[in-house]
Amino acid sequence: YSSVMLSDTAGIDKDEVCIRLEQATDTAGLKKEGFTISTRGNMTTVTGNDGNGVIYGCRELIDHVGQYKDLKFPAQLTDAPEMVLRGGCVGIQKMEYLPGRGVYEYPYTPESFPWFYDKEQWIKYLDMLVENRMNSLYLWNGHPFASLVKLEEYPFAVEVDEETFKKNEEMFSFLTAEADKRGIFVIQMFYNILLSKPFAEHYGLKTQDRNRPITPLISDYTRKSVAAFIEKYPNVGLLVCLGEAMDTYEDDVEWFTKTIIPGVKDGLKALGRTDEPPILLRAHDTDCKMVMDAALPLYKNLYTMHKYNGESLTTYEPRGPWSKIHSDLSALGSIHISNVHILANLEPWRWGSPDFVQKAVNAMHNVHGANALHLYPQASYWDWPYTADKLPDGKREYQLDRDWIWYKTWGRYAWNCHRDRSSEVEYWDKQLGDYYGTTSAEAGDILEAYEQSGEIAPKLLRRFGITEGNRQTLLLGMFMSQLVNPYKYTIYPGFYESCGPEGEKLIEYVEKEWKKQPHVGELPLDIVAQVVEHGDKAVAAIDKAAAAVTRNKEEFGRLQNDMHCYREFAYAFNLKVKAAQRVLNYQWGKDLNELDAAIPLMEQSLDHYRKLVALTDSTYYYANSMQTAQRRIPIGGDGGKNKTWKEMLVHYENELANFKANLQLLKDRAAGKVTESAAEIKPLSAANVKILNGLTPVKLATGANLFSNVPGKVDALAAELEGLTAYRMNGDVQRKEGTTIEFEAAAPVNLLVGYFRDDQKKYAKAPKLETDASANDYGQAEPKLTNAVRIAGMPLANVHAYHFEAGKHTLLLPKGYTMVLGFTDAQVTPRNAGLAGAEETMDWMFY
């Protein structure tokens, strides 16, 4: 090809194709980013409604050449995107905490993020966005300001050395300039309230503390940071997350309206700008509508964002309370962004179902009222830019290379989700055929494998999961205890009501069977049967395609292995669910034969899990890319442990051994070989601590008064708690200020805190990892004793344990009534204290 001036086109040979690019001068009634292509003879004219429209018109011609291998461009074609923003996100975060730092605290440095300074890699990513007609790039980080701007009032707040600071300036300028050339809007995300580490240390503060109040110092520092960022990087937008280190919704409103928006305005004023660039507000861990109602009178150009299926991909039929959040925000009339977030249930295997994605994007429009897309990587978000794959030569595979179909599907349907299904099958057959060097017909088997396997993880999580969040890594499996008593593990509220069709949990299904009650919606045994069928079909299709592959053979081998992984996982899960059904049958009918029948099912499940171990041991470094204490299901992921199937196999084998031993115990009891005796529960030993902030001690016993402002006394409490030194609190003060405990311990201790089981605003919220990433910093995420304290006129309470090493400590608890039950130097054995009444659950059979 060659470039010619428009004045010279008369001399073009009739056999040559001339492409003319122009931008519309009269844009009245034209859609943003749209284009028109018209061909007359050998002249094809691309007219963009704006600069982006010209770019996307050119992409249309490139796609035509790739699809049809000719230059016979359309006589007339007009197109424009359905979604206003269409973008991908990159996390400037890591799989583990940096030494001495908390969650999300990652300064921009070459040591932590060498890839961030790789310009060639950024060009490749930006070009990928353009290829898929995406127009936005989101950078996620806890507190980016201390890596990118300097404040005259707080010069010590910068978290990087001078050389790195200059590199960061240069990279940000480069990235925004290259993005701008491609019509891409760069948006920096940040959490609140996070402080720079040197700033926090200078003033004796924590970098983040969910339960501290907003102070003038913290507000001033953040306001000035935002202003300096806006002034220095005027073409970079801000995505504001009002969690996960803010206490109340009222604090969120105050922070956004009195710190963030004024900071943006200060930056604009310094530039002499009177326009309002968009500020994006996440509806995560906040009441977004409440914030928007307060903020819109102050700043008009506000966009909203909410997670599509939470932190997983579970359905293209969303409903319930989480869908209402979307529709309420959409009704405000601003741009509403659907966030395809984390994808915890898809890690780490390949996923790329065009049919699922097209239906999901339709749901974003029709159910949620969204008109923009924010897209996470398909897997390994925390390990960007690498995948979890182990390559034979020890090198790492890049996500952009492996997961090209992920970005292509979401980009294609964010542009237009109303495409004809039969034409789409032809399109994807051609795409896959070109990539793997097969005919379109042969590539149809690869598409079939993607679409069959694409149903497995979504269906299983929405019907059996504890949460859609980072807290659970589905594809490592689940314990029997989690299947027979999911409530013990704190099912995330709203998950089952929002992230799939109406249906039943296994525990509900069995109860209805025994009570002869009608079933409703999607049923657990149907789902496990379906995923087995999906797995069989995916493997049959991918194996059938194998002989035809002539290109990217190694990558095809990895895709083929993933399909086999999905199949073995589906088989293992199916058999485990059937075993759990038998155990639940025993709970209702007390027939020991039901427990006997569970054993071969568990053994067969393990056989398939061992095959899964064999398929993954040499092919994957890990399943989950978030490798911290936040990962709790199926088991804690503290310190990067329990992240492979090989590690999990040992736990699942122990689970079966425990079950067999406990079953034998039941049989011995039934045969009269064991005499029943109530296990003696001894009180916990009190730890010797020195209280530094004047709390009022009270001996913990029946009749004790734990609140100075309410008459109710302790009616009953778990035997473990008898005799501990608790502390009398004022509930009204707790509601207004939260609870502070300052103490000194000579040896490691556990502080026991009681949270009331009630969602009224007056009661402090128990730790919840879905909305507070620091909720397990002290090992407090799960209750140690459930139904353990009863006070007259108040709800039952669960007891959580906060572990501290020797030394001086200050703990802030959330606002609301909560009980400080004392310190112990003993380990607390988890159990249901049963003050709610006798409720036998079957999870004990597996311990």
What spans do the regions from the language model cover?
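Acidic, contiguous N-terminal accessory segments
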Residues: 1-41, 74, 705-713
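Feature activates predominantly on carbohydrate-active enzymes
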Residues: 27-215, 234-235, 338-340, 361-362, ...
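Catalytic-core regions of glycoside hydrolase
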Residues: 68, 112-115, 135, 166-169, ...
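C-terminal non-catalytic alpha-helical accessory regions
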Residues: 102-103, 377, 398-644, 651, ...
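Glycan-recognition and processing domains
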Residues: 678-735, 838-847
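Extracellular and analogous surface-interaction loops
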Residues: 730-733, 737-750, 800-809
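A short beta-strand element within beta-rich, extracytoplasmic domains
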Residues: 747-759
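Contiguous ligand/interfacial binding patches
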Residues: 764-829
